[in-house]
């Protein structure tokens, strides 16, 4: 049986004050770091309960979720009371550093255009003495853009942004009882973001707000529910030259759609499973492991139903609008699988496969640009630059706009080997592409068709070098094109037969 009382076990602890809350004695030094209710709500056993190891582990897990705490230690001391053996329980908590400031500086190279970005963030891990985590981050970026035609006012790209969030270590929802909230071990997050982008072609601002929940199940499964996410995209200025060249011609409905003011109101759910849970030490997986990720997102359905019910008149483009601003409507789903196969201490294989699809309907004919897929780059098919591959067999037309799609397939296999010190080598093969759901005249070959999509899978190969510094991994990859779906002739379709560094 467990009981709570003061004992000589506290003689080694530096304390000078105490308080009683709901029958629990709480000892501390100078100032109580967390509210008493926070402490008692995270206990999974009470005085008088029979000892249960599962309750102890759940208590460790509950306190481990609190970012305001660094260490948790639960001690039991046997005490004889008459003919019974009792356990005196002491939960000892060590606070973490609750305030921190961090800086980040990065250099960018987008197809030869050099730039720089910097950010500063502040974090408070105990804002209201309940282990609430508050974060605010400021970011700025600058890039010189080359290859512009005449008619643009400048040749640089400037971006400013600020984001802030507050994370509560418990489930918050109105009209829900305290007992129910205590049983659901979820965190609640509220966030705000604002972004300002000034390019030669346009000036765009984006503002968003979100409300989400996250919780962990059996240490291996993570759930996230985005209850609501509201984003507003506003373009106060678009270059006349840009309108003339790309928008007013009416050749590409995607461009027209994405350079209009837009409202996105969406909700979603994501599921993540990792077979090793929290047993990863120094970025080294102790045994074979795998992970599964699933994500689902929908937008505009509630607003569309209300618009229909209220018999609201559509605008000139055939869209329902809120205060004159049309809203997006779509469904988006993603599935991702990754597996690590350890051969021995020095060698392993890593496999990854993913698929994603986004379908516009109802109030929209196109997916918002921010929700579309792109291919190429360090986290995709590494033989192509970011947003340089696809859609389908489309080779690109050299304009300023990135190519994107509604469907994405990705797969890779990588052999990794420890070289020396903290360096690791890698050999990889990547495959994948993106496609559009609808056919567009200025993107020939970009639409997805079952009888030919497999012929449009791009393949790349290459070598990589990893510097594993435990707290982060520095990665260098060099990829070459092996199969290029943009060309049909044998020599250009299979560049692996005739490799050329300047081309591939």
Language model segments and positions:
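Periplasmic polypeptide-binding modules associated with outer-membrane biogenesis and secretion
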Residues: 3-109, 139, 179, 331-333, ...
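Transmembrane beta-strand segments of outer-membrane beta-barrel domains in Gram-negative
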Residues: 27-34, 100, 153-354
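Transmembrane beta-strand segments that form the barrel wall of outer-membrane beta-barrel proteins
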Residues: 76, 99-109, 118-120, 131-150, ...
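Residues that define the transmembrane beta-barrel architecture of outer-membrane proteins
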Residues: 85, 114-118, 156-162, 203-207, ...
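Extracytoplasmic gating/loop element in the C-terminal half of outer-membrane beta-barrel translocons
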Residues: 87, 348-428, 432-440
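Transmembrane beta-strands of outer-membrane beta-barrel pores
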Residues: 107-109, 126, 138-144, 168-170, ...
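Residues on the lipid-exposed face of transmembrane beta-strands in outer-membrane beta-barrel proteins
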Residues: 118-124, 162-168, 192, 209-213, ...
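Predominantly the C-terminal beta-signal and adjacent terminal strand-loop region
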Residues: 347, 384, 470-504
């Amino acid at each position: 049986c467990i009981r709570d009382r003061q004992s000589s076990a506290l003689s080694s602890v530096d304390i000078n004050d105490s308080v009683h809350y709901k029958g629990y004695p709480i000892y501390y030094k100078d100032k109580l770091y967390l509210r008493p209710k926070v402490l008692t709500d995270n206990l999974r056993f009470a005085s008088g309960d029979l000892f249960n190891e599962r309750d102890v582990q759940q208590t460790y897990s509950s306190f481990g979720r609190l970012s305001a705490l660094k260490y948790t230690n639960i001690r039991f001391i046997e005490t004889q009371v008459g003919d019974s053996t009792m356990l005196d329980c002491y939960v000892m908590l060590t606070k973490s550093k609750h305030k921190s400031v961090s800086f980040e500086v990065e250099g960018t190279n987008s197809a030869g255009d050099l730039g720089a970005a910097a950010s500063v963030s502040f974090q408070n891990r105990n804002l209201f003495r309940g282990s609430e985590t508050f974060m605010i981050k400021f970011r700025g970026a600058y890039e010189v853009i080359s290859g512009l035609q005449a008619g643009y006012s400048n040749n640089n790209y400037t971006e400013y942004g600020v984001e802030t969030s507050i994370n509560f270590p418990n489930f918050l929802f109105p009209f829900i009882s305290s007992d129910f909230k205590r049983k659901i071990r979820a965190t609640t997050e509220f966030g705000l973001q604002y972004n300002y982008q000034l390019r030669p072609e346009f000036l765009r601002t984006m503002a968003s707000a979100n409300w989400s929940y996250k919780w962990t199940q059996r240490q291996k499964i993570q759930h996230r529910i985005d209850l609501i996410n509201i984003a507003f995209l506003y373009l106060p200025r678009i270059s006349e030259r840009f309108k003339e060249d790309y928008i007013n011609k009416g050749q590409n409905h995607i461009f027209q759609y994405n350079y209009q003011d837009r409202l996105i109101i969406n909700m979603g759910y994501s599921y993540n499973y990792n077979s090793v849970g929290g047993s990863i030490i120094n970025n080294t997986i102790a045994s074979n492991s795998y992970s599964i990720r699933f994500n689902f997102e929908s937008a505009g359905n509630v607003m569309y139903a209300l618009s229909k019910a209220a018999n609201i008149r559509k605008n000139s483009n055939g869209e329902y609008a809120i205060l004159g601003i049309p809203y997006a409507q779509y469904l988006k789903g993603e599935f991702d699988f990754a597996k690590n196969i350890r051969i021995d201490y020095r060698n392993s294989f890593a496999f990854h496969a993913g698929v994603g699809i986004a379908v516009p309907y109802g109030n929209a004919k196109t997916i918002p640009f921010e929700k579309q897929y792109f291919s190429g780059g360090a986290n995709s098919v590494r033989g192509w630059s970011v947003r340089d591959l696809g859609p389908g067999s489309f080779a690109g037309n050299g304009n300023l706009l990135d190519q994107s799609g509604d469907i994405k397939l990705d797969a890779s296999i990588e052999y990794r080997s420890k070289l020396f010190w903290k360096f690791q080598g890698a050999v990889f093969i990547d495959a994948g592409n993106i496609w559009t759901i609808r056919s567009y005249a200025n993107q020939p070959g970009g639409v997805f068709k079952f009888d030919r999509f497999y012929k449009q899978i791009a393949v790349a190969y290459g070598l990589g070098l990893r510097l594993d510094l435990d707290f982060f991994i520095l990665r260098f990859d060099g990829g070459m094109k092996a199969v290029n779906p943009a060309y049909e002739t044998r020599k250009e379709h299979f560049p692996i037969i005739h490799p050329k560094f300047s081309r591939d």
